[in-house]
Amino acid sequence: MSFSLKVKNEVCKHVEVNKQEAIAELSAIMKVSGTLLFTNKQFNFKITTENAAIARLVFKILKEHFGIHTEIMIKKNNSLKKNNIYIILISEEEGVKSLLKEVGIIKETINVFSLDYNIPKSIIECDECRRAYIRGAFLGGGSISNPEKTYHLEFVTHNEEYAKDLSNLINSYNLNSKVIKRKNSYIIYLKEGEQIVDLLNIIGAHASLLELENVRIMKEMRNNVNRLVNCETANLSKTVNAAVRQVESIKFIEREIGLGRLPKNLRDVAELRIKYPDESLRELGKMLNPPVGKSGVNHRLRRIEKIADELKQGI
């Protein structure tokens, strides 16, 4: 089961809603996944989904809050590995015109009906109604990527005006959703893990929220470990390269003039470095008599390298 499907199934089990919340949630579902039909001079409205849980939720809301008794039709999807398609058809006999006005899909002016592409302010007046609306929009046209791979949550709609309205509603919760056009659709999206967590909280997907948070924590830990390993690897590489360079310089001096020509403090360090090529500067310093600190050992080895360079240049 995809993470997106898991979130939607969880959201469909949301606690009971009151009439105003039901209006907001159903309005969003109908706006993003419904089709208004006008045949034989009659209005019909079709809601289509591939998710059985969403179809059952719509059926329940229509029955309990609007007194509309309809049926869920199941259509086999012939495409390979595709889910069934669930269709809820609301006819004029079932009061579709009244429903469409109540949920803000159509508006009437002097007996003329027209589609309302905005989110009616009257159905999102309270906080719970706003949350219900965003929840419905996610159920109808939302999706979320597998957080193991990437952080991306989006809503798909076909009207730019509506997309901007929905984005503004989402952003009223201190989020930063953006709107882009993709072919013939408008996409409202969030890409930051923390903001996606906040949106899951808004729509009531608390179990999915915790799962995403766990993934975020694990990814952050892995990234921190990787950064630490990379840093230590880089430091180790520098240390090894420096040790190799020091040993080569000491051996060159030994061949050219002999280590006996070096001052005693440099000769002692040179002999220890040849004998212990893998030891750190701090450990080499402890072996000297008297002991010398890391910076002191480093200074002496730099002087040895400088002497080797001068010998190579014939100075």
Swiss-Prot record:
Keywords: Cell cycle, Cell division, DNA-binding. Residues 280-313 bind DNA. The keyword Cell cycle applies. It comes from the Bacteria. NCBIfam families: DNA_bind_WhiA. Involved in cell division and chromosome segregation. This is Probable cell division protein WhiA. It comes from Clostridium botulinum (strain Hall / ATCC 3502 / NCTC 13319 / Type A). The lineage of its organism: Bacteria, Bacillati, Bacillota, Clostridia, Eubacteriales.
